[in-house]
Amino acid sequence: MSFSTIMQQLMSGMISTVSIFLLTLLFSMPLGLAVAFGRMAKFKPLQWLMKLYISVMRGTPLMLQLLVVYFGPYYVFGISLSGYSVFVATIIGFSINYAAYFAEIYRSGIESIPVGQYEAAKVLGYSRVQTFFKIIFPQ
């Protein structure tokens, strides 16, 4: 193999890696925020379900999760993945894994905000949504 052939293959792999990384961030960060809200919800079954999801995702190896996402549809539904669907399965696997980690980061950050900031927003007449997006989320 020549040097240029090797470099072309390496560049192709780098493009795939960067695209997987960017798409994983694009999907896992909002999903993690939704999971964090579910984890902090007052509705106990939802809170319990999100806690279970986070525990399973953080407690099992990523490689095992990727294998389940890749081979699971075949064994459960008889759907064989090939071509572009393999890439999609990879994005789904990484996204659901990293969403659990982002959820804990978001939850701990939100819960660390002093109560006085919520009270100050209430005095200023902010709604709960305004309080979150203008005061809590930027921190």
Where are these regions (language model features)?
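Transmembrane alpha-helices and adjacent helix-loop boundaries
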Residues: 1-139
